[in-house]
Each structure stands twice: as structure tokens, then as C-alpha cells.
Regions:
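Conserved, structured core segments of small domains
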Residues: 1-117
Length: 117
């Protein structure tokens, strides 16, 4: 009987990179195709759980009553998207993350393991 490998859940937070309004049509097409290829491969390998870009508008809330403390409109360090993946361990999740197309445009990936609850 084969031993079942338990996969762990990881969150990838995408920040920065070129703003789409600063890209040429060719850059936008290449970037889009790179993302679709990468995500398609993750889906094929059953590693992609969910992932979406985020809209530009948003608010940072704080305190007991959720007071508005910030807007994201001009913040270049704002999270622009996220992805949830499954991997055997942190090393595999890191390897997967290193293939992210955001690096081609100067962006970053924050990789976090989800805690068991």
C-alpha cells in the first residue's frame, strides 16, 4: 500500500511590479500569457487551489470600530493579488514561487505557510 503524502497549504502574496498603465500592449500581452502559462501548469499539477488579482481600490481598517486608516491608491507596496497553493513542504512551495512571472516586472512574492487549525 502506497504511503499517502500530506500536502501543506501556502499563501503567495504578490506586490509591486510594473503598473499595467505603464506597459506597452506587447508587454501586457506577454505578461498575461506568462501568468496564464504558469497558473495553467500549477493547475495541471494540482498545486493551485485559488488565486486572483485584486482591484486597486481598498481600505486599511483599524481599531474596535474599523476606523479607516489608509487607502491603497498610491501605495506601491500594496498586495496586488494572491494565490493559495499546495506543496509537500516549504522548499517545494519556494520552488513553485520562484517560477512566478511577477519577477519579470520587478515585483515580489511573499510566501507563507498556513497554520493547521
Amino acid at each position: 500500500m502506497a504511503k499517502k503524502t500530506t500536502k501543506k497549504t501556502y499563501l503567495l502574496l504578490f506586490r509591486g511590479g510594473l503598473d499595467p498603465v505603464e506597459m506597452t500592449p506587447d508587454q501586457m500581452k506577454t505578461t498575461y500569457n506568462n501568468w496564464m502559462t504558469w497558473m495553467g501548469q500549477l493547475k495541471k499539477n494540482k498545486q493551485l487551489t485559488v488565486g486572483h488579482p485584486l482591484e486597486d481600490d481598498g481600505k486599511m481598517l483599524s481599531g474596535m470600530k474599523g476606523k479607516d486608516v489608509a487607502s491603497f491608491e498610491d501605495d506601491k507596496d500594496t498586495i496586488g493579488g494572491y494565490m493559495v497553493i499546495s506543496a509537500k513542504n516549504f522548499a517545494e512551495a519556494t520552488r513553485i514561487s520562484k517560477g512566478c512571472p511577477i519577477f519579470n516586472n520587478g515585483g515580489t512574492v511573499e510566501l507563507r505557510e498556513a497554520a493547521e487549525m
